[in-house]
Amino acid sequence: KSNLAQALGIRAIQDGFTVYYIRTATLLEDIKHSRIDGTYTNLVKRFARYKLLILDDFGVSAISVDDATNLFEIIEARNQLCSTIITSQLPVKDWYGYLQNNTVADAILDRVVHSSHRVTLEGDSLRPKYGKIDENYE
């Protein structure tokens, strides 16, 4: 999933688009820090400007209700204006439980699912094949 998203991001850059790749957990941490240091509005505007935002590993790390609301703010700022790729091992049907707040989950899913192209990948991870550690590594 990550490799495919990165390949699409590279192609978008080659075609002249602005692209930003970030793990979802890192984005949520950045948002928390921006709320503390007073740069939240600028952060949301910055993420709204990229023609393609790649949110990798959605659903891997636990999030709070505040995190879900913050994620909604980013998605809302980009809604209908720019493209967003979300990679996840979590089936969409499980997003309600993951996001913990049905109102926020409804808002996010309404913006993401109804205007998306879903790609479901089957098969084993490529990491064991291409990400092998040298056998001499200690």
Where in this protein do the model-derived segments appear?
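Walker A/P-loop
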Residues: K1-F17
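Walker B motif beta-strand of ABC-family P-loop ATPases
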Residues: L52
